[in-house]
C-alpha cells in the first residue's frame, strides 16, 4: 500500500486496520489521550468499540433546482440544509446521551463499546464523544448534469467545488459543536430511487437528472458511461479524500473479463489508497434459465 488515502495512511502510521461498518462506512480517528486530535506524536487512534449514530443525506440536485426556482444563491440554500442535518445530529446525540447504561448493559456497563464501564443508572452521554455522525452525499453526477448539462465524466468541476464546500462547512461544525461529524459517500440502494421520485414530483423530468429510475450514489460516475476501469478510478479519485466518513470505489467487469487484468486493477486501486469493490455482470442461460456468477 502506498500510504495514500485515509485507510492506508492510518495503517502505515499506526499499524491500525480500519474495518468498514457495513459496505463502506468508516470511523474518523479518535485518539486515546487527545480525543479528536492526537495529544502528541505518541498518541494512537482507537477504532474498536466505536460506532456511527447515523447518516442523513443531502439531495443535491433538488437543492440546486430549489435555488434556481426561487432565484436564490445555491450555497445559501445548501447552508440551510446543512444546518438542518447538523441540528438533527445534535438532537440525536442529546437523545442518546440521556439514555441510561442499563438500556444495554453489555455495551455500556460490560465494556462492549469503547469506554463502556458505566454503572447501570449512569447516562451514556460521556460515551458518545468518540462516535461519529455523517452528512451523506448522493447524486454528485446528477448535480453536475443539472448545473451545466455535463456529467462528472465530462466536467465535474462544479460537483468538486460543492463537495469541497460541504467538507469545509462540516469541519467548521465539528470544531464548533465538538462532535465527530463526517462526510459519507451514501450507497443509497433505495434512496437513489426515492430521490428521483421526489425530484419528479417537484420539478418534473429533466434529461440525465430525473429521467432514469435512480440517481448515482455518492460521487460515482453514472453506470452507463463508456469509460475504462482506469478512467473510472481516476475520475472518481478527485472526490475520494473529501468523504472520509465512508466511501467505496468500484468497477464493473463483464463476466468473461481477463482475471489477471482485474487483479492488476485491484492492485492499482490499493496503490491509490482506495477501498475497492469489484462488480461482475451476471451471465444468463436463455435455454435453462440459469444464472452464473464467476468466483
Description of each model-found segment:
Residues 1-129, 150-152, 156-290, 294:
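Conserved catalytic cores of very large enzyme subunits
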